[in-house]
């Protein structure tokens, strides 16, 4: 864990504001570096360290950082509908704002300050820093501001982060109406307002609007520019003191947290148990029509584990949500660990589904010195300079590198690096190599150039949308033979791409991949044969962090074509196959949505993904998750379909208040708990009253959840019971969540307009 930072003596904010120089006050209002605020040593004001933390705390390094615990993605956590569990987890995101507030309370109970983001209407990556989101005042307040308002009221987070985009014509980071007016005066917000990274676009305007802290540092738009704005009276001394006071109050609050002075891996048994519970409790049982689940492993003689996600530990999404876990478990690992000895396991990939060619693992390569991984050496000079000096060197365990925040005092913005390794071919046949880069890079195999991503570059989605397409080459390898791999890389300023509207995080990035080429038809045929032979077939498909990531929007809702063909082919020969899907967001389930009989959705489940899946499959844990969002049958059925994407710098929110499933919903009865739709999604959000939800618990004891809504003298009483298939009453371990709200009104209302959550204490009749 590292040594705990010693507590500093407290500091007097009024004394500092009275005695600090103009330069010292100005320095407080921008970051010191990529992950720290600026200290004031003369007044005993420390620096505050920040980090991304939507599903785990990465620390202060994207590159060569400390490995961390990874929790399930936000939509997965929202699917638990369990505030006490989220409080324990300290995990942030979810469409249901009440669990979000529970996370904030849990995280801040340790002294850590939570920052909620992105305020507000940050709903697309296309032209992220320039797009103008145009919407009605009602839609803005009832849909896009309401989650922030509730989270602030319920949990008092320590900071709010502004979004990159504009809303109704003005960037949020310089909107006095939204920051000083609505957030501070109307809502009574007392905490810090900080920019997203490189999301400050002005000096005086942003400061006067209420933006306290520009991140990251070193400053671009404060410092000398702010001194000039004060000298020219575009910013008053009173405003400067007001912003400095807020930053000092933020630091004073943060200094109470007892955190490690040195970043190191935390891996405790209790953390693993909590992570496993989170993974299992987030899983949603979408179908169990034939009553196949739970499986009894003692009765199985053979199991077919099929699909591209089966041996892939899809534990998190991409972008700011990505981190390197200290361990991970794939569905294959979790399932096979709970099978008794002697059960035959038939594994087939069946199809490829990657968005980028899979990275090289440390076990597949070794450095020139013979250690696992790839050697990386940094230089000031390009390869053309003879006897250039190595400035820094390290060993990386994955064949990707993201260098924003990376610094070395001897390197300028433009620097160079060589990535080298020895590869022992795992098989004989054609292998495809891939290379994507922000900056420039070339790949050599045994000193022969096979990929040139330097001379000519094509724009792609890599590295938050700033990088190139993945350029590829196919090479025949011989099993057991040694090959020398070398990538010559130059940092971000060497890029030939010009991409307006995209955040420039600096540094540079690269990704090297390798995969054996397979015949798609043959791969499906092998999977079909395995499904025919096995007692039980479990089919694992879905998306990964390469499909769902910060920096770009998905252009469609489809799974890769080969995956859809695989699902259909397997269901043709094994109609009782268990379908296991993974994603953080909806995807198209046609044409097989109505064919599958048993379906579990597992999200991106964190470190314990595979074990959580196995616990549900084998009845160790009740699948109590409920969808926090809807899976539409097709993208054309979504309310935003006609309006999505920036056109001439603007996106119109034509759906108004009818976001998500709300457009499809009617409320003909007096109770808003009933969900009825015009064009039913494949799987609607939440659950219905007047219907039965089947769940299972260990020893195949099935549980039926009965929800009754009774009306007495104008008031509603909710009665919730659970009974086993054999008529026994008891607890299944699930966490019920019920909402109430108006359904019919003269004024058009969404289902959650004015909705109130009925607390768990309301189920005393259970």
UniProtKB/Swiss-Prot annotation:
SMART domains: PA14. Its EC number is 3.2.1.21. GO terms for cellular component: extracellular region. Its main location: secreted. GO terms for molecular function: beta-glucosidase activity. One of its GO terms (biological process) is cellulose catabolic process. Glycans are attached at residues 19, 288, 453, 748. Keywords: Carbohydrate metabolism, Cellulose degradation, Glycoprotein, Glycosidase, Hydrolase, Polysaccharide degradation, Secreted. Residues 742-756 have a biased composition (Polar residues). Pathway: Glycan metabolism; cellulose degradation. InterPro entries: Cellulose_deg_GH3, Glyco_hydro_3_AS, Glyco_hydro_3_C, Glyco_hydro_3_C_sf, Glyco_hydro_3_N, Glyco_hydro_3_N_sf, Glycoside_hydrolase_SF, PA14/GLEYA. It catalyses: Hydrolysis of terminal, non-reducing beta-D-glucosyl residues with release of beta-D-glucose. The active site is at 196. It is an enzyme of class 3 (hydrolase). Coiled coil: none annotated. Residues 726-766 are annotated as: Disordered. Transmembrane segments: none annotated. Residues 369-528 form the PA14 domain. It is found in: Secreted. Belongs to the glycosyl hydrolase 3 family. Beta-glucosidases are one of a number of cellulolytic enzymes involved in the degradation of cellulosic biomass. Catalyzes the last step releasing glucose from the inhibitory cellobiose. This is Probable beta-glucosidase K.
């Amino acid at each position: 864990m590292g040594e705990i930072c010693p507590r500093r003596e407290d500091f007097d904010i009024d004394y500092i504001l009275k005695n600090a120089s103009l330069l010292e006050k100005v320095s407080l209002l921008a970051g010191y570096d990529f992950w720290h605020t600026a200290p004031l040593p003369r007044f005993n004001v420390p620096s505050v360290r920040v980090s991304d933390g939507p599903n785990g705390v990465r620390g202060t390094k994207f590159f060569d950082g400390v490995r961390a615990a990874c929790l399930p993605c936000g939509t997965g956590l929202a699917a638990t509908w369990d505030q006490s569990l989220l409080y324990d987890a300290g995990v942030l995101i979810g469409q249901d704002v009440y669990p979000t507030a529970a996370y904030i309370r849990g995280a801040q109970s340790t002294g850590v300050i939570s920052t909620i983001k992105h305020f507000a209407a940050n709903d697309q990556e296309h032209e992220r820093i320039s797009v103008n989101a145009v919407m009605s005042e009602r839609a803005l307040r009832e849909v896009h501001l309401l989650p922030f308002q509730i989270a602030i009221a319920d949990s008092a987070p320590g900071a709010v982060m502004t979004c990159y985009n504009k809303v109704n014509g003005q960037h949020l980071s310089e909107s006095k109406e939204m920051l000083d007016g609505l957030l501070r005066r109307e809502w009574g917000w007392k905490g810090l307002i900080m920019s997203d990274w490189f999301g400050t676009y002005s000096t005086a305007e942003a400061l006067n609007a209420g933006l306290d802290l520009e991140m990251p540092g070193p400053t671009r738009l404060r410092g000398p520019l702010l001194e000039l704005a004060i000298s020219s009276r575009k910013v008053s001394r009173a405003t400067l003191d007001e912003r400095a006071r807020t930053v000092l109050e933020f630091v004073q609050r943060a200094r109470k947290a007892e955190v490690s002075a040195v970043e190191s891996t935390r891996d405790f048994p209790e953390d693993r148990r909590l992570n496993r519970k989170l993974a299992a409790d987030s899983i949603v049982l979408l179908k169990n029509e034939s009553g196949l689940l739970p499986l009894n492993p003692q009765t199985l003689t053979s199991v077919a584990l099929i699909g591209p996600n089966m041996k892939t530990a899809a534990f998190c999404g991409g972008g700011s949500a990505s981190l390197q876990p200290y361990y991970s478990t794939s569905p294959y690992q979790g399932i096979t660990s709970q099978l008794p000895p002697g059960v035959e396991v038939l594994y087939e990939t069946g199809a490829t589904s990657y968005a980028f060619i899979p990275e090289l693992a440390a076990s597949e390569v070794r450095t020139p010195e013979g250690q696992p991984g790839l050697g990386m050496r940094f230089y000031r000079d390009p390869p053309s300079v003879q006897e250039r000096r190595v400035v820094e060197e390290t060993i990386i365990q994955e064949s990707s590198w993201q260098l924003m925040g990376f610094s070395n005092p001897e390197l300028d913005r433009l620097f160079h690096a060589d990535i080298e390794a020895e590869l022992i071919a795992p098989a004989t046949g054609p292998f495809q190599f891939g290379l994507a880069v922000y900056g420039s890079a070339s790949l050599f195999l045994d000193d022969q150039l096979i990929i040139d991503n330097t001379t000519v570059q094509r724009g792609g989605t890599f590295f938050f949308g700033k990088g190139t397409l993945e350029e590829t080459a196919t090479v025949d390898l011989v099993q057991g033979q040694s090959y020398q791999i070398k990538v010559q890389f130059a940092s971000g300023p060497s890029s030939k791409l010009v991409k307006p509207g995209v955040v420039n995080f600096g540094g540079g990035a690269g990704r090297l991949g390798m995969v054996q080429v397979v015949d798609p038809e043959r791969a499906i045929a092998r999977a079909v044969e395995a499904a025919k032979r096995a007692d039980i077939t479990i089919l694992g498909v879905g998306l990964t962090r390469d499909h769902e990531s910060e920096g770009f929007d998905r252009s469609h809702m489809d799974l890769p074509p080969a995956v859809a063909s695989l699902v259909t082919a397997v269901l043709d020969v094994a109609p009782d196959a268990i379908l296991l899907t993974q994603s953080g967001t909806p995807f198209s389930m046609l044409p097989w949505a109505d064919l599958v009989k048993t379906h579990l959705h597992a999200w991106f489940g964190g470190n314990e993904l595979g074990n959580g899946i196995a616990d549900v499959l084998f009845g160790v844990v009740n699948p109590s998750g409920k969808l926090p969002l809807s899976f539409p049958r097709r993208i054309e059925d979504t309310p935003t379909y006609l309006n999505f994407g920036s056109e001439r710098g603007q996106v119109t929110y034509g759906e108004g208040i009818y976001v998500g499933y709300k457009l499809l919903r009617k409320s003909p009865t007096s109770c808003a708990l009933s969900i009825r739709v015009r064009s039913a999604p494949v799987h609607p959000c939440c659950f219905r009253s007047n219907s039965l939800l089947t769940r299972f618990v260990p020893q195949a004891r099935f549980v039926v959840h009965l929800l009754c809504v009774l009306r007495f003298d104008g008031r509603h009483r909710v009665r919730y019971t659970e009974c086993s298939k054999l008529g026994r009453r008891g607890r299944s371990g699930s966490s019920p969540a019920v909402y109430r709200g108006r359904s019919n009104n003269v004024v058009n209302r969404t289902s959650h307009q004015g909705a109130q959550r009925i607390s768990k204490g309301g189920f005393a009749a259970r």
